[in-house]
Amino acid sequence: MKTRILIILTLMATDSVVFAQSKTQKTAKEKTAMAKNDSTVQKNDIMLFGEIGETVVTGYYSKTKNSFTGTAVQVSGKEMMKVNSTNLLEGLKVFDPSFQVVDTRGIYGSDPNHIPDQIEIRGQNTMPDISQSNLQTVTTLPVFIIDGFEVNVQKVYDLDINRVKSITILKDAAAAAIYGSRAANGVVVIETITPMAGKLQISYTMNGKFEIPDLSSYNLMNAAEVLEFQKKAGVFDAYREGEDAGLNANSYNVARRAVLSGVDTYWLSKPLQMGFQHKHSLIIEASPKTSLPGGTKVRFAANLSYSNLNGAMKGSGRDTYEAGTKLIISNHRIRVTNDLQFSMVDSKESPYGSFSSYTSALPYYQEKDADGNYYRMLSLSNLAPEGIALGVLASMQSPVYEARYLNSYSTSRGMNVTNNFGINWTITDDVRLKGSFSLSHDSDRDDAYVSPGSFEYINNNSSITPDALYQRGKYTLGHSSSTTVYGSMLTSYTHSFGRFDVQAILGAEAKQTSNESDSYTMTGFLGNSQDYISYAVQYEKYGRITGGKSKVRTAGIFCNQNYSYGNRYLCDLTIRMDGSSLYGDHQQTTPYWSAGLRWNVHNERFFAGSSVVSKLALRANVGTTGNQNYNRNQASNQYNYLTKVYGGYFGAIITTLGNPDLKGQTTYNRTIGLEASLWKNRLNLEFNYYNNKTKGNLTSITVAPSLGFDTYKANMGDLRNEGFDFNISYSPVRTRNLLVNVTLNGTRNHNTILKISDALQRYNDMVNANGSGSTTPVFQFKEGESMNTIYAVRSLGIDPGTGKELYIDRNGNTTYTWNAQDQVPVGVNEPDLNGYVGLNIRYKSWEIGTHLNYSFGADKYNYTLHQKIENVNYMTNNDRRALTERWQKPGDVALYKAITDNSATKATSRFVQHEKRLSMTSLRLAYNMDSDRLRGSWISMLRLSITANDLFYASTIRQERGLSYPFTRSVTFNAQVNF
């Protein structure tokens, strides 16, 4: 008689149902044939079942990796701490290169207050919104789940990594289809630590991070070079009607005298400092060693953390506070969990403004006068001796004046309170019931004050009319709040029929989110120190209070079934039906599904006794996921009441044309994968190929105001993302005292537009007809091309005889005239391969590790060449190549047009470059104090480490990075002690 052993485990942190494969005892003959294989399988499924890498946490339930048909990347909290201990989103890129935090031009740098609003997993599957002639940004984010409950990206951005037990990225239909209409951009599931049983433990962690601004991408001219450039460009020549050659000569001589006297102001350093962050985390875990009456056990944990960050730009900062408790009460049948968390974030923007202002300031200007006062305006008149008349003044606003003398500021405060409650009931050995309830409230306040002495009002300085005075100074105050109520019920069934295992889940959930917001602007501040809104005289001219109120309800039912035969052949099915108030009246619900297969080849008899292959599995899955990237008012008509009365009634105008046929876009996912482990798990590899097609892409179209409304939302295009990703790890040395591990991962994704609507084609025609008025490349929707395709006019380079650019028109002829209709695809901003190489060495109590990011094959449009070498403002500083590499005389073979040519350069293939990039993401050294040394003390564990992030960045494309806020290199000191 065969004995059946059924294992059902539960992950305490998420209250998720965990499925393990049932084991059936073998006959003597089977034991002999498969002894080694079964030993490995049972170890994976039982002994190591709770370890990261052996259990896939989906948020609703968990499965052993050997029974999972989907694609998931798993990272432990400890592994994340080794790469980046302060920014979880940046750290995830190291473990999964298909997880991309998008900042295409590197605008935001290391701004601590920039919350990523575009994160892609396996490519872009959402079309951007468009106006009548240009591209608009769109927010694309994966779903973030913490302990089974959905949270926003800011919650993850500010999360204390010390609380994290594991992170799982779900990337295909079999992994994420159970999330239905939310899963098209992927799912990130975070599991926090749970109290340890039978002991009291106190853990304290301190991080101290130094940030050093990285200005290596800037190649600006010094004072002498700027003056030489301006001279050669004819800035001081009297070529305009009415200009006086003598006065212009005076201007040049004044600037030259300043240069010869040694004036060479390095403006880039003025708003910068060494940033510093100190972060403290305290976690207390308690659990009585003895059970309460009835076998009831209690576990309790409390967490408290504080982070103070002063950014690399003076005055910028971000303070975060977290506090919470987790209580678990359980017996042999029922377990109740309650998790209460509070968080608060205070942020402030730098009063020094955008960093790009400092990259433009002329270095032959001084920031202070002879008395040490900061200049309000930078001009040659500041340098000229008294009585000297000037022509060209080259005036510009001092970028430091407002920060030094005025009291303008921009701050925000956000608070969140969340309570998650869960109950698990083990009804029988085969049947379990799980219920969850969550209540979350967010409130935010934004304050922005502009002093009446700001440059914004400089033109009114001479005016003393009351109306002009009442327009000086501005205070904008905004409030927003959001309350989310969520509930779910899930039942699971697991049974084994000999070698045939059946696992099933049936669940339902509902969520309601209520949002409110208001904002208004007041003006008329009579003094710089009157920096609160109550000092204002009136509302902004023609202004009023704006705001909104909305309520979104969603509900879904889902079913997941898993069938397994002998832990060799597995089939996984998921079905979900979603309903949402976001949908149009004609499309109230949308179905989603997935089907997956897995073959554990290593469990076959013909693999028994293999000394090389310890694991080999093939899997494939298909299915659908969805996206709800729009608001409720886009499915119904919206009106605004007019303020004037006609016939005793208020009139109304339509502001939004509703689309009753609007439905969530659907992505059809197809994935095949391979998993293998060789030589006793020394070599582990995973490879996945995917082909995802998104149908009915949601796009906002901005239309002519004459229609009576501004925009409408429609399902207007189909996309495909095709590619592969892989992960390889190898341990050449694995002894008791020495462990060496090498990792390599990579990804390639190609995006293709399959179908566009007539409205999108009209947008293309409009762009090609007039060039949209932009000098830089404009996005176009073209079937067969990528969303990342660069459109420009083909160029033959600069004519050595004239210094003008030669173009190739659409008929193949050469011409000096740029025409928008000649724009063609000239490159695709998609790397051939992007990934990370890692090396980790552990020797006794010491650890050292590093990760390098590589990328090659992408075409990029070099905006620095376009805007800081050509299309330059001659009265500002520019890239040094504007002086050294622009055409100056007939016969010059130059990359850039004539130095005296100040006409606008438009999108051209000259500025498209092929990139190869290598950067060091992290370098870490750690020491773990031997437990023998700590014996007899209150300390049970002591770990010290130092981690450097972003130490270098090397690229074949040289362009400025961090234009709004500079990038930084950071060094973090970490100390963790457990009592």
Question: What residue spans do the PLM features occupy?
Answer:
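Extracytoplasmic gating/loop element in the C-terminal half of outer-membrane beta-barrel translocons
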Residues: 456-458, 855-942, 948
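Extracellular/periplasmic, surface-exposed regions of secreted and cell-surface proteins
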Residues: 320, 326-334, 339-344, 390-450, ...
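Conserved small-residue
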Residues: 203-260, 519, 714, 731-829
